[in-house]
Amino acid sequence: MPVSSDPKTFYIETFGCQMNFHDSEKVVGTLISQGYRQVETELDAGLILYNTCSIRDKAEQKVFHRLSEFRQLQKEGKRFAVLGCVAQQEGEKIFERAPHVSLVAGSASYRNLAEMLVQIESGSQRITGLDDRETDQTFETEFTARGNAHRGYITIIEGCDKFCAYCVVPYTRGKERSRSAESVLREARQMADAGFTDVQLLGQNVNSYHDPSGTMTFAELLTAVGEITGIKRVRFTTSHPRDFTRDIVEAIDNHPTLCDHVHLPVQSGSSKVLREMFREYTREQYLERISWMKATKNRKLSITTDVIVGFPGETETEFEETLALLDHVQYDGVFSFKYSPRPNTPALKYIDTVPEQEKSRRLQILMEHQREIQRANYRKHIGETIEVMVEAENATRAQWIGRTSQNKTLNFTVPQTVQPEIGSYHQVLVTQAFPNSLVGELVG
């Protein structure tokens, strides 16, 4: 394939969380507003951008592999940019490791991206956009290029002040800073006017949101977004148990547009390990929050979580406490990971007493344990009729892919005479269940 000679073309690859993917939508919008055109491969691009994740070492190494893989393209005049958490964490050291990189920019500097693009175009080298964690500014732009015409993100809070012992996010994303409720609601209305019906509010700790004017709590903001005409579903992620309050559950229970799904990372079922992690809650306090969600009057909430296994000092007994917590809560999904040492974090000072092989063993046990819980949970949906939003067609299986308000995938068949529209809502009868998805048939 011929290499594009147009320097104002770009390719972007995104690693990591929803925050990164939404940041990339804003970066893409800014690039397009500056006259750039997006292309599908590195080979066709004049500017190659990697929006990076550093939450675990494996994610961090992916970007350096990409930079090495395509290094020879610099000889053809292509420019490289490293964005996001690895950029903020490693800073100018990236230039030493990958001298062909022209721009290193953390997420807090994206508001200056247009100016940095001018520097790239003028031939400048080693351009940096690195803010300290004390910045009060958030990245708001009218140039968001949303990748989905029906489901979209709104970042309501950036940064993190929790400083968990294992986590690099406070050092790469800066301190917590919230957008005004007025700004969030304005963006939500614009999305509704543009045809979006499913809106997800984002933050590293989304429920730590504090309206700078003091007008709205997080629960009140959720409700206000859900009351906007045209919006059918409101989601939010990720929550921190420390700031998870009962009024959030009450809002979900009483407002059908607020999705009946909460992702509440626990990280460990052992109070001792949680204390070493600096999570600032106990097993019992976490389970109190679960009890609020189990006690709803109008809706049954789906609960998912994150778990780290093999944290320094975690004993077999403490690991078994985590397995017991899974049994107690009956999560609909668990994102589980082996502990990975990260730069600048307090846990680096701990003696990593759990061998890598043992971490892998525990992870496998936990995943298999949770898989059986999910298998039983998903089977309970058989015979139910559930509303889905149509996301895509799976032509090879003669099925359509839908998503429920509980964020579950429901693959379904339709009569030959029916052609659902992407983004439309339909009633589906569940006929089969698997540990990670449901299967059904269109009934309305």
Swiss-Prot record:
Swiss-Prot/TrEMBL cofactor(s): [4Fe-4S] cluster
Pfam family, one: TRAM
Domain TRAM: 379-444
A GO-annotated cellular component: cytosol
Subcellular localization: Cytoplasm
Primary location group: cytoplasm
The entry's keywords: 4Fe-4S, Cytoplasm, Iron, Iron-sulfur, Metal-binding, S-adenosyl-L-methionine, Transferase, tRNA processing
Family the entry assigns: Belongs to the methylthiotransferase family. MiaB subfamily.
Binding site for [4Fe-4S] cluster 2: 160, 164, 167
Function per UniProt: Catalyzes the methylthiolation of N6-(dimethylallyl)adenosine (i(6)A), leading to the formation of 2-methylthio-N6-(dimethylallyl)adenosine (ms(2)i(6)A) at position 37 in tRNAs that read codons beginning with uridine.
Domain Radical SAM core: 146-376
Keyword Cell membrane: no
Catalytic reaction equation(s): N(6)-dimethylallyladenosine(37) in tRNA + (sulfur carrier)-SH + AH2 + 2 S-adenosyl-L-methionine = 2-methylsulfanyl-N(6)-dimethylallyladenosine(37) in tRNA + (sulfur carrier)-H + 5'-deoxyadenosine + L-methionine + A + S-adenosyl-L-homocysteine + 2 H(+)
PROSITE patterns membership: MTTASE_N, MTTASE_RADICAL, RADICAL_SAM, TRAM
Protein name, UniProt field: tRNA-2-methylthio-N(6)-dimethylallyladenosine synthase
